[in-house]
Every structure is written in C-alpha cells, then in structure tokens.
C-alpha cells in the first residue's frame, strides 16, 4: 500500500491505545466509562510524549524513546494515565502482563509479551520509500532467532 508523506501518528497511537485498553477491558474491573477516559488520556499523553520523536522518513529513529515497557516495573506514562482513572500500581500490575514491550513506530505497532514471546504486529502500513536495510529495535532482537517468529493473536481470559 502506498501513501503520501504522512506526518501524523494517529493510526499508530490508536493501535497502541486500543491494545492497552483491551488488556484492561479483558481482565475486568475497569468500567467502560473509565476505559474511555483512560484511552483519551493515554492518546493525549502519547501524542505529547512522541511529538518531537516521530520521524516517518526514518521510522527506527527514536524507537527506544517511543517503546512502552513493563518489566515488573510499570511504564511511567501508563502509570500516570492509570492514576487519572483511580487505578493504583498494584491494580495495574494485576491487570497488565508483568513483561510487555510495545513498540510504537511510524508505520508499525507491535508487541511482545514475556522476554521470549513472539513479536506480534498490531498495525502495519508500508512507508512510501521503505528502507529495509535499517535495523529497528525489534529487528535487532530477532537477529538471534533460529526460526522465524510466529504471529499469534493474543487472547486473555479472566
């Protein structure tokens, strides 16, 4: 799919916000009203956080800065937004995976649950001039794999 030069980050942020909101929804305990407030606040927070770190012409540039990470320690952006809807740190840790990496890059949003989990793509759009030679944070992590990663749809049951 080709497209004109796009500088907005709305589709990517919407994919990331939708994914995180669905994790909270699936695990229960959060009302739809609170989820809507969470989603709007997270969209605003990520848009603000990424505004000087979004480079559609070089999608891998700034990838580490845009990465949302939970590694037994909650990502500060998620933590701040969750506190706005009254979710405490212990509640967040119960509702979200203890190991989650969410990459929000121009033209692609992907995630991995667990340190050795498969990387799954949530959103993908082909850039105008694809530069396949660049190593993104995600691609660097995949270099050591002996077999290709398998993409699975994650389902969480309560």
UniProtKB/Swiss-Prot annotation:
Phosphoprotein listed as a keyword: yes
PROSITE patterns per UniProt: BTG_1, BTG_2
InterPro entries on file: Anti_prolifrtn (IPR002087), BTG (IPR033332), BTG-like_sf (IPR036054)
Post-translational modification: Phosphorylated at Ser-147 by MAPK1/ERK2 and MAPK3/ERK1, and at Ser-149 by MAPK14, leading to PIN1-binding and mitochondrial depolarization.
Pfam family, one: BTG
Upregulating conditions: By nerve growth factor and tumors promoters.
Modified residues (Phosphoserine): 147, 149
Keyword Hydrolase: no
Record key words, sorted: Phosphoprotein, Transcription, Transcription regulation
GO molecular function per UniProt: transcription corepressor activity
GO biological process: anterior/posterior pattern specification; associative learning; cellular response to phorbol 13-acetate 12-myristate; central nervous system neuron development; dentate gyrus development; DNA damage response; negative regulation of apoptotic process; negative regulation of cell population proliferation
Function: Anti-proliferative protein; the function is mediated by association with deadenylase subunits of the CCR4-NOT complex. Activates mRNA deadenylation in a CNOT6 and CNOT7-dependent manner. In vitro can inhibit deadenylase activity of CNOT7 and CNOT8. Involved in cell cycle regulation. Could be involved in the growth arrest and differentiation of the neuronal precursors. Modulates transcription regulation mediated by ESR1. Involved in mitochondrial depolarization and neurite outgrowth.
PANTHER family for the chain: B-CELL TRANSLOCATION GENE, PROTEIN BTG2
Subunit description: Interacts with PRKCABP. Interacts with CNOT7 and CNOT8; indicative for an association with the CCR4-NOT complex. Interacts with PIN1, inducing mitochondrial depolarization.
Homology family: Belongs to the BTG family.
The protein's name: Protein BTG2
Naturally occurring in which organism (per UniProt): Mus musculus (Mouse)
